[in-house]
Amino acid sequence: MIRALGSRGFAPVSALLEDVGSMFVLTGKTLVSAIRPPYPYGNEFVSQFLFALRLGWFPMIVTSVALAYGPAGIQAANFLNLFGALDRLGGLFVLAVIREFAPLVCAIVMAGVAGTAMCADLGARKIREELDALMVLGVDPVKNLVVPRFLSLMLVTGLFDIYALIFGTFGGMLVTLVNGAPLSGFFSTYFTNATTTELWGSLVKTTIFGAIIAIVCCYKGMTASGGPEGVGRAVNQAVVIAFLAIGAFNYVFTQALLATHPELSMVR
């Protein structure tokens, strides 16, 4: 009985570890398939790119401005006003928006709108046994279905990071104007702290976020079972796992960036 209870208690952990291992395997297969010719997924890549772009552009803009103006902007401005140093808001926005908010906003939006749609699409195909039919016909599902989604989501997420930086900065400008301060102080400290390393780090991190979302959502979709309810569970699990993976990678990437570039820890 004790052994049964123990195995039942460790079953979720074992299943999670098995999923993580399988996702790493899928990542390797995807990278190899993306590099190795032939490249039959051009039309599917364009279709998935436009699909993700159409779904995510408006939520991304709204979320970027809202988060930059609200939690980052208003709270930071209230704190700096206590010391009469509102001109330092631009430097803090580099730390908040470029390093954290912009990549995370892109990841949250793309996982919530594009990632779930990809998972549901592949899950429905799995339930209808379309994936098995493709393999019977000699068509590789990884090369023809996963690779275009993987590449398109990386590209769209990296592109959205640029827009998130622009609209996040716009939120900081609004906060500065609402507090009656000139924009010259905001831009002075903003451009003093916004180094090339910081910008490239934000872009690389966001692009990898897109890769993580694509792998997790494609894997959960291609392993869905149990009919329509199973597809719903797969979508739910994909979002949760993607957010956990993004949080873990974000911590590791940021710490590695600060360790290799300690000058980024200082607000000038």
Language-model features: locations:
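Membrane-helix cytosolic exit motif
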Residues: 221, 240, 244, 248-262
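Short cytoplasmic-facing helical segments at TM-TM junctions of multi-pass membrane proteins
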Residues: 122-147, 228-231
